[in-house]
Amino acid sequence: MSERTSSSRRSKPASDDTIGNFVIDKEIGKGSFAQVYSGRHKVTGALVAIKSVELARLNTKLKDNLYGEIEILKRLRHPHIVALHDCVESRTHINLIMEYCELGDLSLFIKKRDKLITNPGTHELARKYPVAPNSGLNEVVIRHFLKQLTSAIRFLREANLIHRDVKPQNLLLLPSPQYREANKMHKQILSASHDSFTPAAGLPSLPMLKLADFGFARVLPSTSLAETLCGSPLYMAPEILRYEKYDAKADLWSVGTVLYEMATGRPPFRAVNHVDLLRKIEASGDVIRFSRECVVSSEVKGLVRALLKRNPVERISFEDFFHHPVITGPIPGLVEDDIPKPEKPVLAETKSRIRRANPELSHTRRSRAGPHLLATPIEPKPNPLEQVASPRLSYSPRQEADEGLGIRRPLAQPSTSAPVRPISYVDRSRRYSNASTKVPARDTPPPPHEGSNRSRPKSAVSRPLTDEDKAAQDVAFERDYIIIDKTAVEVNALADQISLYPQQGQPKSGGQIVRRATQQGHPTSTTGAVPSHPGRNAQGGRNDHYRKASHDKTLSGSPGATTSVISKAIQDASLRLFGFKYSPQMLSKGQSPPQIYSPFPAYPTPSTPAGLIMDGKQSAPVDEDSRVAQCIEDYATRSDVVYGFAEVKYKQLVPLAPSVEHGLGGVPTDRMGEEEEGLTMDAVVSLSEEALVLYVKALSLLAKSMDIASLWWSRKSRPESSNNVHSATRDSVNTQALVLKINAAVQWIRSRFNEVLEKAEIVRLRLVEAQNQLPEEHPSHPSNRPPETSALGGSSGGQATFPSVGISAEKLMYDRAVEMSRTAAINEIASEDLPGCEISYVTAVRMLEAVLDSDDDHLPKRRVSTSSKEEQSVAAQDASDDMSSDDKQAVQKMVQMINTRLTYLRKRMHTIAAASKAQQQQQQQQVVVRRRSGDVTPRSVPT
């Protein structure tokens, strides 16, 4: 793993923190879901990299990626692939012990190319092969790294593996073998095998490249296609950006982008989002230009152009790429010391005798394309992935060649801070990807010696994935990563089209999309609403990752089809989360990719004049766009207060990561019992049920906001709409501001929807785990469910969820609103914290409005028209059929009472502010008068 400068504020772990046979040192990198530490072996002191992943912060798809990465790395042994030494799983974390790459990654190497001479490990390289001004790396270094990267790609190709995230950040560097040989006392790095640091290609005098991060890798035979969209945006192949099925040639495009960046110092295509990136790729017309300052040969330029073909059919094949002169030929321009020496006759004769003595081995190696492959097959035709396993494992420090890499687990301990652990690594041994496929990727039976480790129920192997398994609701991002299933493409299109609408009709500026900065206030609501997670805030500087679906015209012309697709996606997600489908009336909108930048301010934002919270006495909306914006914001505000209430429950269930308070090792063993005594199982079940129903309520309100936006967009996008005719005569500045406001709201709603859905899944897993740990006589134990209730548990995505009878989000919200309003009234009478009283009153009103909000939005019965009746009908359904008339009247009366108190409070605050301002002005006038008259009290002068 690379050594990066960390921006984390986390204190350095104690020196006695250990993971297995390794001692934790300092933190060298950090992501959204994992931290990377340097470490050393207890006995030898050899350096390693420790990637610590917190299980509680991973959704199902990220866990699949992690376990898939572990399963793949367990079998990969190649000099140019980062090796996995060990894997230690604790109660809350999974720790991957990996090879340590002290020179960092290739992106840092390219960025610091002018300062390489200052590093002892790269001083000789910079002296012998200097970089040209305003250009990339020296061509000798480019060809050297390309040969080593090709060696790793060839190794993966012959194992039917596709990496899917080849980029400079995942290409880690080590000092050259010659440098390590000459500086043995500098840093000893733990080796996974006897030839782990012996390059299979390139020059021994230059740094060694290793391919890392197999979180998106999967088994993909040469005749198969994948359709999961994942990887890093700037290095994605265009067929992935177009949501088309793709094969392993997608890696070739990524190799081409890396090669171009090494040659020029920058990526071939720069864009602020995926839509703009695809547009630039298509506009290039396969014409790849190099600047005049770029000093590379025509051979390298030709290879880049052959790799960067938009059409994968026209792209260079793997066979031609592996045999390209740049790959197979000698490196021109070498200094005399680096020119390969001719092989001695005695050594050549020895190798010849070895080949004659082992004809089978020689034939096997020739059939597998030569010396780049260091793993030797045992069987004539084994499973391609098993073919990766090498006898060289016997040289591993762990001596686990026969059984593969084992994962040590601690003794079973109750957990109160993390969701139930996913299925074991054994069950995940064939799940290398999060891609949705209808047939298992591999049907080849395991070798006999692994039968005990790979045994699983027959149903788990043969059961095909259902539609519910493909529900596109697990969206994750770590740095520049993005994962989007095919089912969610329609949901993405709605928000993407709305986000692009403000750009239409405006002059373009350099082909770039300008982002709008938004200040996010700090909530002080007593509901527990909190600002965005620091991990998300840290990512705010990144580009928005919007995607444009390949069927936008269909969406624009058929809003009914769009809403039905979104409803289906929500139902699929609810089936996977809760064990049964919620009706489309309850949840009517689907999920989009999470936005790193949230333009819609989180509730509440008292510092923003045009916030979500309003007193209901503002002037009537001017036009349709104003009414739509008001309706969307009303529902978004109600959902936000419900979300804030749910967060209070959630943060009791999932507290801060153990590594924040106790270092990477988590809670010390002697304090494990104290940490577990915080919540009883009854309390965990109660909190989980309450948080779950509140999250569902928040989802339903967010879905209604998206419903209104969908109807508004369907009219906006129709060219024959009368609105488009009248909009030409309106005030363009006011109209544009309203459209931008709606767009910001839609993007915020989509981001919040993803966050709520992910947290709901964590809560669901926590609830299932807690229910299973209850005594069998407990009413909430799974064995005590009524027979008619068990019929609801038809979930294919996991164990179904059965909340207790009587748990109601409306009841919880009503009690919370009453409690908040009473507390605010007491503080108001005592004249304490009047601004806080105002926030509490407003929050209580919004929460009661959410209680009155109807869950019966009969979406299929709606008729799309050119008027705003749809939004009015949605906003007018404020009475739930599940509530009695007396209950409705009681809630409405409570809303009126709180509004009355709120009006009086605001008048009082205004009076106090006016009096204070008048008093200040009077004091200032008195000071001015005294100064003019000279009546100023002289200061005493010390004698």
UniProtKB/Swiss-Prot annotation:
Q: Where is this region: Disordered?
A: 334-468, 503-561, 774-800, 858-888, 914-943
Query: Which residues catalyse the reaction?
Result: 165 (proton acceptor)
Q: Which residues bind ATP?
A: 28-36, 51
Question: SUPFAM superfamilies of this UniProt entry?
Answer: Protein kinase-like (PK-like)
Q: Which UniProt keywords apply?
A: ATP-binding, Autophagy, Cytoplasm, Kinase, Membrane, Nucleotide-binding, Protein transport, Serine/threonine-protein kinase, Transferase, Transport
Which residues does the UniProt record annotate as the domain Protein kinase?
A: 22-327
Q: How does it sit in the membrane?
A: Peripheral membrane protein
E.C. no: 2.7.11.1
UniProt keyword Kinase present: yes
* Molecular function (Gene Ontology), one example: protein serine/threonine kinase activity
Compartments in which it is found? Cytoplasm; Preautophagosomal structure membrane
Recorded catalytic reaction(s): these are: L-seryl-[protein] + ATP = O-phospho-L-seryl-[protein] + ADP + H(+); L-threonyl-[protein] + ATP = O-phospho-L-threonyl-[protein] + ADP + H(+)
Low complexity composition bias: residue spans: 919-928
Q: Where is the composition biased (Basic and acidic residues)?
A: 338-352, 542-554
Spell out the Polar residues composition-biased ranges: 517-529
Which Gene Ontology BP annotations are present? Answer: autophagy of mitochondrion; cellular response to nitrogen starvation; cellular response to potassium ion starvation; piecemeal microautophagy of the nucleus; protein localization to phagophore assembly site; protein transport; regulation of autophagy; reticulophagy
Question: By its UniProt entry, which CDD domains does this protein fall under?
Answer: STKc_ATG1_ULK_like (cd14009)
Q: Which Pfam families match?
A: ATG1-like_MIT1, ATG1-like_MIT2, Pkinase
Q: Quaternary structure?
A: Homodimer. Forms a ternary complex with ATG13 and ATG17.
> What's this protein's function?
Serine/threonine protein kinase involved in the cytoplasm to vacuole transport (Cvt) and found to be essential in autophagy, where it is required for the formation of autophagosomes. Involved in the clearance of protein aggregates which cannot be efficiently cleared by the proteasome. Required for selective autophagic degradation of the nucleus (nucleophagy) as well as for mitophagy which contributes to regulate mitochondrial quantity and quality by eliminating the mitochondria to a basal level to fulfill cellular energy requirements and preventing excess ROS production.
* Protein family according to the UniProt entry: Belongs to the protein kinase superfamily. Ser/Thr protein kinase family. APG1/unc-51/ULK1 subfamily.
Name it: Serine/threonine-protein kinase ATG1
Q: Which organism is it from?
A: Chaetomium globosum (strain ATCC 6205 / CBS 148.51 / DSM 1962 / NBRC 6347 / NRRL 1970)
